[in-house]
């Protein structure tokens, strides 16, 4: 809404004028990521009050745990959360218009002798969130952290013996689902280093930890047994490229009352194909009910719309450099939710679209939204991304979308997108701010008024590829 003094400032712009930051690192994190978060909240029609609330929580309680602001010249902790090692990622539940973000908590001790493998920062971050959100329960967090991440003795053993080279160093991360002015919290655990330290396989660590938990919470035992049987039978039948083993990769759970919390086990599938996705969806033919088949038809529909190349992939290593244009394809993935009292694990499959043309991905998603009569999302989705990255050539970008997840329960489809979240909005804000992702920057754009002091702006046309 415009006034006689000009257009109203956005929530992000207003907060940017009000907020003080303790250092340049937090200021840069805010201006690099908050524009896209604000745009997503607005797209999903969060009330103005809730937009202010959620952006305030992000600034005060999340940004201080993102660590060194990533640049090409600074040494930093590399997070498995993104291919660029950036420890923050926005995602959007398109079916319910729910905003979500995930981050790997990082502090000053991360990567030092005090905490070489970032075991401890998450403890402080979780405690800070408990103080502002009712209903967070750490029982399962504490249990799985002990089971799946290294303790100080194991950390010293790994460090002193030089056993950590190219393994995933990330051990844990947190995710917030934003519900009005509240949020729910989830934790993810990667036991790669625990496997090295203990000599136990990832399968033994992940499935074993859940099996021991089921001694107390027997209501998750049946779906665990079903999933374990599927993975074991798949792996026993592995015989080369046609039938590849499934590799457990990580585990997540809701940080709430354990009787309401869900455990999710994530499996890594190297074969990228529709047949592999069908096998993941049906647990090798174990799920054959009508709901499963209805969901499978939509999986096939998405596969056809997205046109993902069929291939055999390992997870690439090492990380991509900031600003590097991906020339790669990621392997597939699925997670399985173990619901209390439900004997059948619930699948969620991931379409790996990182490295594919983002404009084509948007077109495919928009068509899927239209077919589901998600008219608001169909109308707004492309504009949301264009507004989040207004200075980029969106016909050329191929790194905004990382994954598209799909599940189907109670006769309803659920689709989420996982998005590159860095240097969004009218970046660069400050004349001396570096820009890593500039290959597809458009140099024909003049600076737009972003509500900040004009002296802080740097014209986009000054960027050089």
From Swiss-Prot:
GO MF annotation terms: tryptophan dimethylallyltransferase activity
Gene Ontology biological-process entries: ergot alkaloid biosynthetic process
Recorded superkingdom: Eukaryota
Chain residues that bind substrate: 100, 186, 188, 262, 264, 266, 348, 350, 414, 418
Catalytic reaction equation(s): L-tryptophan + dimethylallyl diphosphate = 4-(3-methylbut-2-enyl)-L-tryptophan + diphosphate
Keyword set includes Transferase: yes
Keywords, comma-separated and alphabetical: Alkaloid metabolism, Transferase
Enzyme class: transferase
The UniProt record lists the keyword Transferase: yes
Residues the record lists as binding L-tryptophan: 80-81, 89, 190, 249
A matching Pfam family: Trp_DMAT
The protein's Enzyme Commission number: 2.5.1.34
Recorded metabolic or biological pathway in which this protein acts: Alkaloid biosynthesis; ergot alkaloid biosynthesis
Protein family: Belongs to the tryptophan dimethylallyltransferase family.
Quaternary assembly: Homodimer.
Database matches in NCBIfam families: arom_pren_DMATS, trp_dimet_allyl
Job of this protein: Catalyzes the first step of ergot alkaloid biosynthesis. Ergot alkaloids, which are produced by endophyte fungi, can enhance plant host fitness, but also cause livestock toxicosis to host plants.
Protein name: Tryptophan dimethylallyltransferase
Biological source species: Balansia obtecta
GN (gene name): dmaW
């Amino acid at each position: 809404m415009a006034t006689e003094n000009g257009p109203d400032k956005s929530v992000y712009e207003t907060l940017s004028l009000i907020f003080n930051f303790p250092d340049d690192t937090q200021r840069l994190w805010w201006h690099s990521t908050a524009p896209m978060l604000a745009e997503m909240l607005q797209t999903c029609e969060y009330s103005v009050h809730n937009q202010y609330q959620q952006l305030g929580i992000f600034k005060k309680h999340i940004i201080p745990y993102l660590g060194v602001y990533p640049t090409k010249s600074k040494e930093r902790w590399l997070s498995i959360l993104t291919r660029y090692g950036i420890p923050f990622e926005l995602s959007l539940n398109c079916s319910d218009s729910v905003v979500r973000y995930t981050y790997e908590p990082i502090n000053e001790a991360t990567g030092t002798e005090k905490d070489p493998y970032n075991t401890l920062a998450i403890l402080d971050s979780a405690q800070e969130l408990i103080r502002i959100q009712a209903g967070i329960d750490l029982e399962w967090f504490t249990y799985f952290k002990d089971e799946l991440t290294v303790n100080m003795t194991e950390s010293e053993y790994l460090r002193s013996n030089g056993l950590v080279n190219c393994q995933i160093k990330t051990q844990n991360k947190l995710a917030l689902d934003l519900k009005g002015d509240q949020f729910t919290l989830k934790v993810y655990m990667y036991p790669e280093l625990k496997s090295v330290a203990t000599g136990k396989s990832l399968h033994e660590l992940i499935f074993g930890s859940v099996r021991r938990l089921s001694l107390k919470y027997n209501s998750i035992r049946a779906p665990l047994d079903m999933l374990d049987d599927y993975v074991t039978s798949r792996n026993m039948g592995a015989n080369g490229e046609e039938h590849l083993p499934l590799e457990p990769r990580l585990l997540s759970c809701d940080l709430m009352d354990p009787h309401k919390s869900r455990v999710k086990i994530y499996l890594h599938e190297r074969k990228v194909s529709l047949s592999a996705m069908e096998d993941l969806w049906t647990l090798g033919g174990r799920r054959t009910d009508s709901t499963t088949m209805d969901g499978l038809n939509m999986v096939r529909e998405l596969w056809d719309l997205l046109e993902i190349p069929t291939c055999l992939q390992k997870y690439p290593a090492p990380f991509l450099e900031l600003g590097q244009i991906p020339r790669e394809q990621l392997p597939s993935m699925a997670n399985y939710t173990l619901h209390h009292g439900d004997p059948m694990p619930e699948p969620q499959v991931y379409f790996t679209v990182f490295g594919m043309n983002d404009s084509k991905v948007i077109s495919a998603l928009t068509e899927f939204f239209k077919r589901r009569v998600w008219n608001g999302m169909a109308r707004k989705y492309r504009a949301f991304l264009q507004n989040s990255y207004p200075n980029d050539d969106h016909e050329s970008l191929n790194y905004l979308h990382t994954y598209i997840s799909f599940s189907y329960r109670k006769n309803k489809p659920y689709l989420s997108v996982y998005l590159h979240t860095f240097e969004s909005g009218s970046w660069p804000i400050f004349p001396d701010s570096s820009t890593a992702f500039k290959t597809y920057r458009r140099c024909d754009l003049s600076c737009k008024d972003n509500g900040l002091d004009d002296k802080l702006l740097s014209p986009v046309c000054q960027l050089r590829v």
